[in-house]
């Protein structure tokens, strides 16, 4: 199944968090929280402005991003994999 986000929505596959610290300690509970980094796997056409124009998104497929786990972030399972559906405004940075 493929997924195509609408407007300014972005589909992100969350990066897995290491379950061990650099010193070899196994992390559990709050120390092993979910990552706020991921890879963009699909983008919408862009934000619709008040004048009706469409502003293309700044992110593109393949970008590594840091995102906020805000109110509008939705988690879905697509083909057995968990993905996040979020607005471009929930993306804080592109990792270069």
Curated annotation (Swiss-Prot):
Localization: Cytoplasm
One Gene Ontology term from the biological process aspect of the record: chaperone cofactor-dependent protein refolding
Subunit relationships: Heptamer of 7 subunits arranged in a ring. Interacts with the chaperonin GroEL.
The species this protein was found in: Colwellia psychrerythraea (strain 34H / ATCC BAA-681) (Vibrio psychroerythus)
MF terms in GO: ATP binding; metal ion binding; protein folding chaperone; protein-folding chaperone binding; unfolded protein binding
Function per UniProt: Together with the chaperonin GroEL, plays an essential role in assisting protein folding. The GroEL-GroES system forms a nano-cage that allows encapsulation of the non-native substrate proteins and provides a physical environment optimized to promote and accelerate protein folding. GroES binds to the apical surface of the GroEL ring, thereby capping the opening of the GroEL channel.
NCBIfam families found in the cross-reference section: PRK00364.1-1 (NF001526), PRK00364.1-2 (NF001527), PRK00364.2-2 (NF001531)
UniProt-listed CDD domains: cpn10
Name of the protein in its database record: Co-chaperonin GroES
SMART domains found in the cross-reference section: Cpn10
Keywords: Chaperone, Cytoplasm
Main localisation: cytoplasm
PROSITE patterns, per the entry: CHAPERONINS_CPN10 (PS00681)
Gene from which this protein is expressed: groES
Annotated GO CC locations: cytoplasm
Native organism taxonomy: Bacteria, Pseudomonadati, Pseudomonadota, Gammaproteobacteria, Alteromonadales
Pfam families per the UniProt record, alphabetical: Cpn10
Family: Belongs to the GroES chaperonin family.
Source domain of life: Bacteria
């Amino acid at each position: 199944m493929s997924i195509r986000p609408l407007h300014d929505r972005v589909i992100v596959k969350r990066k897995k968090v290491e379950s061990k610290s650099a010193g070899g300690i196994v992390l559990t509970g709050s120390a092993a929280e979910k990552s706020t980094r991921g890879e963009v796997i699909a983008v919408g056409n862009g934000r619709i402005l008040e004048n009706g124009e469409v502003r293309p998104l700044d992110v593109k497929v393949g970008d590594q991003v840091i995102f906020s786990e805000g109110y509008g972030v939705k988690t879905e399972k697509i083909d057995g994999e968990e993905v996040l559906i979020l607005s471009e405004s929930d993306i804080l940075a592109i990792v270069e």
